[in-house]
Amino acid sequence: MATDLGELLVPYMPTIRVPRTGDRVFKSECAFSYDSPESEGGLYVCMNSFLGFGREHVERHYRKTGQSVYMHLKRHVKEKATGAAGGAIPRRRNGKVFLDLELNRDFNGDDYEYEDEAKLVIFPDHYEIPLPNIEELPALVTIACDAVLNAPSPYKKQESDSWEEEIQVSRHARSLRQLDNGVRIPPSGWKCAKCEMRENLWLNLTDGSVLCGKWFFDGSGGNGHALEHYRESNFPLAVKLNTITPDGADIYSFDEEEAVLDPHISEHLLHFGIDMLQMQRTENGHHTDNHVQPRISDWEVIQEAGLKLKPVYGSGYTGIKNLGNSCYLSTTMQVLFSIPEFQRAYAGNLQRIFDYSPLDPTQDFNTQMAKLGHGLLSGQYSKPPMKSELIEQVMKEEHKQQQQRGISPKMFKALVSKGHPEFSSNRQQDAHEFLLHLINLVERNNSGSENPSDVFRFIVEERTQCCQSQKVRYTQRVDYLMQLPVPLEAASNREELIAYEGKRKEAEENMRPLPEVVRARVPFTACLQAFTEPENVPDFWSSALQAKSAGVKTSRFATFPEYMIVQLKKFTFGVDWVPKKLDMSVDVPDFLDLNRLRATGLQAGEEELPDLTPPIVIPEDTRDSSTNNSLESPEIDESSVMQLAEMGFPLEACRKAVYYTGNMGAEMAFNWIIAHMEEPDFAEPLAVPTYMESDLPSPSLPTTSALDNQPPEESISILTSMGFPRHHTIQALKASNNNLERALDWIFTHPDCEDESEAMSDTADTEPNDNSFSNANAHTDSSLSPDQDLSSPRVRDGPGRYELFAFISHMGTSTMSGHYVCHIKKEGRWLIYNDHKVCLSERPPKDLGYMYFYRRLSSC
């Protein structure tokens, strides 16, 4: 038989590889679906590429590549036999479990056991060879099989590269002993039991003692009494008192000598009278309890805690597992795939996308979007428990709710966050920033006639007026969402807020419990009014005066999108630059009419500002030099730089992003960063352009020589990413001296430049252009604005009346922590998507949302 197997494998030996360092082995998830070794058909791992495939997709890979040898992995879940007393037989070491897979939480480890099975399968005849089979298989095949079975998860490398080291669960957490000594921790007034320290205090989770932490070299910290107590008592776990929030707390294990996780921290704190849901992180340690008379917290209201929510199953009702601070991604994707255009673009084109996917589909954005869309919409991974299972539970007198499993977005997250310093980390992120990041990826990877992100795109008209000359300038820009300021001064309960603030300060000064928190109630109409108010333009250069002057700017909608995203600007920076969230309630309407905000363009009686370019200031020593010299350091909006740096990007990269986007704001600079972050000089210092003496303009002549130069590729990329053709962007940049803001204005005001466009088009044909989005503009779309020129961004203009169909809510004190859930209206009923759980919503908290999604009403 050994000879037979050896001869059988001879034709395939050149295709069987042993995984090398750097090879990623996907043995837990299919590249095209969410099938795993636990699925009915198991998982097939290619012995050449080490990609995993479910039973429905392995044939496609075989036909495309000709690879014939696969390792088939299958995990069987069996209920343990019961003992004489009715309980499960005690667990023994199971030698039949060898796959590095997470245990299915739906099956209690004490009542179920696992058995793993592996075998080689040769296509197309599906000839099977059970493993292990050392005696009969060639040595190379045996080594390759062992290497595949023992290979680590392909995501562990990425996780270890994250800025933030993953914190492990303490081995003491599950069996922690807590003394029943009657200790109750007060909400304020703590101090170390052995000294007078009131900062850096730690609560021992065994006996409830409050002691100070260790001393730091800068003089802060404490006297190390918490560590001394551990050495005397051997009580291992302690929690830092001023870090307790509904999201968790900072926990340290003296025994393991590192920060740890405690999955049972809520129960352990409740033993000493501390309710996590009523806690808020503080910096000074003087208090944590928000209020003595507990108000129902955001966590309970938004998650609809305490209500018996009915789980739902089937197509469109599949949850997404939380990978650890990945809820910002899950909620965003749930909402996007409730939109028909995204469903059609990816799930609707599933077979075409899969058939034309590259050899490594795990690195293809469209493939992974189609996979995620199918996983959420097919209903294949959201099936209700079988009647037999429910009957069995009743017979056993078990009434526990059946867990919804959901799908794991590991492969998708690894791809869309690749190279991004924030999204690739394990930290919580801003769902708004991730949405813009994803739209950027959708546009960069779109090559079809229908770009699903078109439904969000609209044009904003900005009217800037010189306060001295009263002349105006109208410009237009592209945007994808409406950011609404929330004016706290317009709160309907302003008197209550003022009274609360006084009581809070008094309580802090006297170290007394804080009063019940009062949440600001801001009318939505006040938010709209704040959006329409004129804003001052800093450093405004008036072409009428040819000097800097005071200027004001107002914004209106030149077009209305098919879907309007409204973001409430709840997050801000404190005086210490720590991001924080404003505690507010906004009465967001179910129906929204924005028609009164439609742009009107230049009005009768208004006079336009002259179309002049601000002068370029050149130092005298540069004029006299005969060698290359750089211009003065450019003006860079430092507030935008700091905003980007706070996201974790290198400072020099932030400066370049703001510079190359013409100081047009952090959002535009963020898009530049996403497009250039993989370049080798991404974090190198900004190099200001230089000019030869012969290129320097004479003071008495127009500055035309500089315009003859090719515009920077960065500026071209930014404009083409907005949907403008490359030749038109080059024209616009040359006409505006490479100023992005004026180039945008030029594009909108010069739609018909036929002769020059044709000339530029010939040039563009010879230049490399890998922007797939600009190629997509060659396709016509009947749903676009009828009078829209092909050189304009693709927008779907129409009436500005909308109906709310989804909203994303955030719980927590800042974007750096907390939790996201989303509510979506489907088939006339609201549902709540909370990680892997999908249930009918009883009380959708529309007033506490963060991002709201509206669809245009068909009849207006």
Curated annotation (Swiss-Prot):
- GO cellular component labels: cytosol; nucleus
User: What are the GO MF terms of this UniProt record?
Assistant: cysteine-type deubiquitinase activity; cysteine-type endopeptidase activity; ubiquitin binding; zinc ion binding
Q: Does the keyword Acetylation apply?
A: no
Q: Where is the composition biased (Polar residues)?
A: 769-780
Q: Where is the composition biased (Acidic residues)?
A: 755-768
The active site is formed by 327, 819
Q: Which domain of life is it from?
A: Eukaryota
Q: What is this protein called?
A: Ubiquitin carboxyl-terminal hydrolase 13
Gene designation per UniProt: usp13
